Amino acid sequence: MPKVIGLTGGIASGKSTVSELLSVFGFKVVDADKAAREAVKKGSKGLAQVREVFGDEAIDENGEMNRRYMGDLVFNHPEKRLELNAIIHPIVRDIMEEEKQEYLKQGYNVIMDIPLLFENELENTVDEVWVVYTSESIQMDRLMQRNNLSLEDAKARVYSQISIDKKSRMADHVIDNLGDKLELKQNLERLLEEEGYIEKPNYGEGD
């Protein structure tokens, strides 16, 4: 019977890379970030609700959500984050549920790629939780390089989530991403072999 696995981790922990690798191994990935973008795409009901609640500044000159403005707003005002989540989350859940059911019907194991799985208390909606683990210092380095953030801003983003150590303790399986991409792939393959998703290579001498 196909399984539904919740994949999560800290910000900049390498979760997207793991998702890509899992899709290569035959899993179907349902991406919460992608669903969230779809929920407020240009012309959508979700975006109309965002404009109604947050005003015209929430929409950019192309008629799309002003992500920089909204990102700063919800990061600095937790009550605004709750208002935005109240609009987006129900739409995102519907999009993800529909996609998940379609894949299950076809017999695929499904990865629910959800950055804030524990923060939104969604662990009971999946069969297992896998956490991509890295150190906080690596998270901050990646954020500073990838998002061009100062150390203080990177720290603020890392500490706005449940710590990666706590998430790891709550997980069914932890995927170590303290090394490079090759090591990450090897760690993931080891887990998939142990759990029976892929066969262990046969290093025997043959017939």
UniProtKB/Swiss-Prot annotation:
Listed GO biological process terms: coenzyme A biosynthetic process
Main location: cytoplasm
Species per Swiss-Prot/TrEMBL record: Staphylococcus aureus (strain MRSA252)
Name under which the protein is recorded: Dephospho-CoA kinase
Top EC group: transferase
Coiled coil regions in record: none
A GO cellular component entry from the record: cytoplasm
Alphabetically ordered keywords of this record: ATP-binding, Coenzyme A biosynthesis, Cytoplasm, Kinase, Nucleotide-binding, Transferase
InterPro entries tied to this protein: Depp_CoAkinase (IPR001977), P-loop_NTPase (IPR027417)
Pathway assigned to this chain's UniProt record: Cofactor biosynthesis; coenzyme A biosynthesis; CoA from (R)-pantothenate: step 5/5
Primary role: Catalyzes the phosphorylation of the 3'-hydroxyl group of dephosphocoenzyme A to form coenzyme A.
Residues where ATP binds: 12-17
EC numbers, comma separated: 2.7.1.24
Domain DPCK: 4-203
Membrane spanning stretches: none
SUPFAM superfamilies: P-loop containing nucleoside triphosphate hydrolases
Family from the record: Belongs to the CoaE family.
Catalytic activity as recorded in UniProt: 3'-dephospho-CoA + ATP = ADP + CoA + H(+)
Taxonomy, superkingdom: Bacteria
A molecular-function term among this protein's GO annotations: ATP binding
Subcellular location as annotated: Cytoplasm
